Each structure stands twice: as C-alpha cells, then as structure tokens.
C-alpha cells in the first residue's frame, strides 16, 4: 500500500469565521495555525498547502493572561543603526489590533514560501464586520 499524497489541485478548502472575543491569544493562535496548515484533515501532507481559510473577527478583544498586557513586548527594526523600535501589548492592541494576532500565528507557521501561502489564507478584522459574506463561512467555535 502506498502512502497517500495530497495534490494541490484536489484540496478542498473551506471558509471559517472565528470570534476572538475574550479568547486567550496563544491558545487561539495555535488552533488557527493548525487549521491554516490543514493538520486537522486526514489528507494532510507536509509539503502541500491543505489548510482552510480563516476569518478572525473582534481581534481587538483578544485576551492575555497575567501581566502580559503591560510586559509583553513587540520589536521591529528599521535596518539602520539604533533603529530598534519596541512597543508593548497594550499600545499595539490600541494602535493595530490585527497585528497582534497576525504576529502570533505567523510565528507558528512554517518559514518559507509554503508558510507564506498558508498565512495569506488568514484574514483578521478588528471589529465584528468582515467582507467575506460571499464565501459563506461557517462559524468555528474554538
């Protein structure tokens, strides 16, 4: 018996919508990363993008535990000497709420072209509205 290998043209991708209200950041991100990779499907193949599309709403209401709201730092470098910028969770969630969840999920996906293709299937919105009603997404309770 030969090992099954999924072919990119035969992969069935579904659309799911996830409400991030009061969900813990890391637990939510790990479940989203698992679904973007397709590891929840029996036809999962490591070198083929078998994952689903995920729409995340209410990203501004995601929760962190303990003192992480004040202590968790995010870093960015401009490439110039002395160009390291840092901001904490509270400031980033107030300024760019989508970026918090995007950075968490992106770090859990494979690095390289396949990981970037998986990441493009995630759509994050700060509020409750999204523009993907035509895809008829199913509600995914995490």
Curated annotation (Swiss-Prot):
UniProt KW Cell membrane keyword: no
InterPro entries: Ribosomal_uL13, Ribosomal_uL13_bac-type, Ribosomal_uL13_CS, Ribosomal_uL13_sf
Xref: PANTHER family: LARGE RIBOSOMAL SUBUNIT PROTEIN UL13M, RIBOSOMAL PROTEIN L13
A cellular-component GO term for this protein: cytosolic large ribosomal subunit
Record has Ribonucleoprotein as a keyword: yes
MF terms in GO: mRNA binding; structural constituent of ribosome
NCBIfam families per UniProt: rplM_bact
Entry protein name: Large ribosomal subunit protein uL13
Gene Ontology terms: biological process: negative regulation of translation; translation
Swiss-Prot/TrEMBL keywords: Ribonucleoprotein, Ribosomal protein
HAMAP family membership: Ribosomal_uL13 (MF_01366)
Subunit (UniProt): Part of the 50S ribosomal subunit.
Role according to the record: This protein is one of the early assembly proteins of the 50S ribosomal subunit, although it is not seen to bind rRNA by itself. It is important during the early stages of 50S assembly.
Organism per entry: Alteromonas mediterranea (strain DSM 17117 / CIP 110805 / LMG 28347 / Deep ecotype)
Family: Belongs to the universal ribosomal protein uL13 family.
PROSITE patterns tied to this protein: RIBOSOMAL_L13
């Amino acid at each position: 018996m030969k090992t099954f290998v999924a072919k990119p043209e035969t992969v069935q991708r579904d659309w799911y919508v996830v409400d991030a209200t009061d969900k813990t950041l890391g637990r939510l991100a790990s479940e989203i990363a698992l679904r973007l990779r397709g590891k929840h499907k029996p036809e999962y193949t490591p070198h083929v993008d078998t994952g689903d599309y995920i729409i995340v709403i209410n990203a501004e209401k995601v929760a962190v535990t303990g003192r992480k709201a004040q202590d968790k730092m995010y870093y960015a470098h401009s490439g110039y000497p002395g160009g390291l910028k840092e901001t904490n969770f509270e400031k980033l969630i107030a300024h760019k709420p989508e970026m918090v969840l995007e950075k968490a999920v992106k770090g859990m996906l494979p690095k390289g072209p396949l990981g970037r293709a998986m990441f493009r299937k995630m759509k994050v919105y700060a509020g409750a509205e999204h523009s993907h009603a035509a895809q008829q997404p199913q509600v995914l309770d995490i």
